[in-house]
Amino acid sequence: MLNKAEQISEKSESAYVERFVNAGGVETRYLEAGKGQPVILIHGGGAGAESEGNWRNVIPILARHYRVIAMDMLGFGKTAKPDIEYTQDRRIRHLHDFIKAMNFDGKVSIVGNSMGGATGLGVSVLHSELVNALVLMGSAGLVVEIHEDLRPIINYDFTREGMVHLVKALTNDGFKIDDAMINSRYTYATDEATRKAYVATMQWIREQGGLFYDPEFIRKVPVPTLVVHGKDDKVVPVETAYKFLDLIDDSWGYIIPHCGHWAMIEHPEDFANATLSFLSRRADITRAAA
């Protein structure tokens, strides 16, 4: 029988298991499904973000072919919220520590949305010995002006109405927002420890003027990279995708129409199939070169 830290979710056609691991002293929650080469999914940095709400419709598709691990980032979901400065360096360190703690047999592929994409990118540059491939989806990491559509995220006021505004900013205009999504994200966001961590995270981003790297750092990405972007992304404009493609030598692009910042939520099958196609192609090339 599974203990409470290994509860099976039956919310999707392929069950995933919730587990926890100590990653560099940070108790870290993750969901796991499938077998094979490991693929790590990393959610974005909006209030109330966590692995299940962001990836529940993608996990079962990817898990038909891979061992899928969807983690809660430092300060989000059910992962611990230590009293630290929530910088990008700390998020990179946490992801590195998580990968090491999982004791994977070989390298991992990283799939990240927004802040999660930027964090995966950082690990791929600084710890390339751990990473096989990278998927950036609506990724942060390049300079984006803190414009009006970012304000519901950066200045989230911890009200339910504010959560509705946040989700509207993150999705395309035709996306139907349901109460279950709002209620779940609002519950996570207003947890006292999560709230404190989120305020610290957004304060750091405001002080830095955004979440970005020097372009020369991005040029150092050494692994094959798929850049996925919603054509109607209001938070990180689609032009950013082309900048990533220009900077990362071994990169492919996939633009999804009628899609905002959340391809994995707005168009989960399209996004998952594009990711599978990319990962399988990379595996074929790797086998041919062996």
From Swiss-Prot:
Q: Which gene encodes it?
A: carC
Signal sequence annotation: none
Q: Name one GO molecular function term.
A: 2-hydroxy-6-oxo-6-(2'-aminophenyl)hexa-2,4-dienoate hydrolase activity
- This protein is called what? 2-hydroxy-6-oxo-6-(2'-aminophenyl)hexa-2,4-dienoic acid hydrolase
The Enzyme Commission number assigned here is 3.7.1.13
Q: Name one GO biological process term.
A: carbazole catabolic process
Which pathway does the UniProt entry assign to this protein?
A: Xenobiotic degradation; carbazole degradation
**Active site per UniProt:** 114, 233, 261
Hydrolase among keywords:
yes
Pfam families linked to this entry: Abhydrolase_1 (PF00561)
